[in-house]
């Protein structure tokens, strides 16, 4: 029996910026890939998550959101701010996004390494700051979205993402639904 969700995918877009240099962008990309693989391998999500890269500029955000709008397989977009991602760079893309949006407010690491933490770690792992600013700009713009707060590997977080994915699939099906009233 075919899974009705197999025809769909949800795109995962990470927010960052080039301020911290190329090594940071490489690390952000590696963390994002690990998260997407972990989400898909959890067995808890009905729709495949596809990593669409790290957006480091307004133009990159706009391009990926336009592509999401034009891809029938994409039924929603998950955003995550790995480092401090300036909220203003998301404005034009958010204005154009027509697909359901989930803001995943999480950290890559479950535990904070208090004993070894240094400025490099802090610069790379600013999800709390970036996610708050992203949430603020979405609220100011009145962007409809689902916000999921919690560690990305936890059962409750995965459950909330899965529920949202099923809603996205229903939304996608309704976009070309023909009804006849008798």
Q: What residue ranges belong to the model's regions?
A:
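Glycine- and acidic-residue-enriched helix-capping/strand-helix junction motifs
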Residues: 17-33, 121-127
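A charged, well-structured terminal subsegment
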Residues: 134-168
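Periplasmic-binding protein-like
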Residues: 74-84, 102-104
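Short beta-strand elements in bilobed, periplasmic/extracellular small-molecule ligand-binding domains
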Residues: 38-54, 144-150
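Conserved small/polar residues in nucleotide/adenosyl-binding loops
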Residues: 180-182
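Short, well-structured alpha-helical segments in soluble
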Residues: 61-75, 91-93
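Short, acidic/small-residue loops that bind anionic groups at enzyme active sites
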Residues: 92-118, 122-133
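Structural motif
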Residues: 53-66, 157-161
């Amino acid at each position: 029996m075919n899974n009705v969700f197999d025809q769909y995918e949800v795109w995962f877009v990470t927010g960052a910026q080039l301020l911290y240099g190329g090594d940071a962008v490489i690390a952000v990309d590696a963390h994002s890939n690990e998260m997407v693989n972990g989400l898909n391998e959890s067995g808890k999500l009905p729709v495949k998550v596809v990593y669409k890269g790290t957006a480091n500029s307004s133009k990159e955000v706009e391009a990926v959101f336009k592509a999401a709008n034009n891809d029938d397989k994409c039924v929603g977009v998950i955003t995550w701010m790995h480092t401090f991602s300036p909220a203003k760079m998301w404005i034009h893309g958010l204005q154009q996004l027509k697909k359901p949006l989930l803001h995943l407010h999480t950290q890559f690491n479950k535990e904070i390494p208090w004993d070894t933490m240094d400025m490099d770690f802090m610069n790379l792992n600013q999800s709390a700051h970036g996610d708050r600013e992203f949430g603020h700009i979405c609220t100011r713009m009145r962007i409809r979205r689902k916000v999921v707060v919690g560690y990305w590997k936890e059962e409750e977080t995965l459950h909330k993402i899965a529920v949202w994915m099923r809603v996205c699939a229903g939304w996608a099906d309704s976009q070309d639904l023909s009804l006849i009233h008798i």
